[in-house]
Design a protein with these regions (language model features):
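Short, mixed-charge low-complexity intrinsically disordered segments
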Residues: 37-54
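A short, exposed loop/beta-hairpin motif centered on an aromatic-Gly-Thr core
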Residues: 16-29
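Intrinsic disorder/low-complexity segments
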Residues: 10-11, 24, 52
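Short intrinsically disordered terminal tails
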Residues: 1, 15, 52-54
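A short beta-strand micro-motif
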Residues: 2-10
Length: 54
């Protein structure tokens, strides 16, 4: 199982704007699909996924 965290980094300044705990996932690919969806909806940001194995 994996604990997922999403970070929004503003592209222009590379400043971290938001950090969101997205919960627990059985597979990393599920969290990656969620990250990709957020990235497509927020073009001014780089959306980073951090996974921690628990």
């Amino acid at each position: 199982m994996y604990k997922g965290i999403i970070k929004f980094v503003k592209r222009e300044t590379l400043h971290e704007e938001f950090v969101i705990n997205i919960g627990i996932f059985n597979r990393p690919s599920t969290a990656e699909r969620f990250r990709k969806m957020l990235q497509e909806a927020n073009v001014g940001y780089d959306v980073l996924l951090i996974l921690e194995r628990i």
